[in-house]
Amino acid sequence: MENLFLKYSIPELVKSLEKRDLLFIDIANTLIKTISDVEKNTHAWVCSDTDKIKNSFLQAENEFNRNGVSQPLRGIPFGVKDIFNTKEYPTQMGSPTWEGFTPGNNARVIDSLVFNGGIVAGKTVTAEFAVHALNETLNPHDVTRTPGTSSSGSAAAVAR
């Protein structure tokens, strides 16, 4: 399967979806495979759910078919650092104290991305409360190293 995220820029992906040169499910499948491939070696993701991803892309496609309104991030997935609240996934802040906590709301920045067509792909690993302590995330280019602390999951998830 071709990695669409390496072939197209964000504006090109959006345009291809809106012209129907690409299908929303193509992006969903690329995302799911990318997360799976990265996760095997890096432990970059706290949580991501294949069914939620497919459902979000299906909803985005249905909405586009209904109203056809262009959005700057239509169908573009994004990972969320696990210190930002999301409706779909727990916000644990890298801490066992907050394990399983689901806030029931999105942080404003998440609402803004979703309002503009973005799709939540899941939550990426962070150090406890996003400070100092190392975690289990590994550098995808050298698994004997870590990408750091606070944004380690985000860094490992996008490294190529």
Which residues fall in each region the model found?
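An N-terminal boundary/leader segment
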Residues: 1-55
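Short glycine/serine-rich loop/turn segments
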Residues: 74-160
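Immediate post-signal peptide segment of exported/extracytoplasmic ligand-binding proteins
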Residues: 60-77
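Long amphipathic alpha-helix in the N-terminal Rossmann-like dinucleotide-binding domain
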Residues: 51-58, 114-118
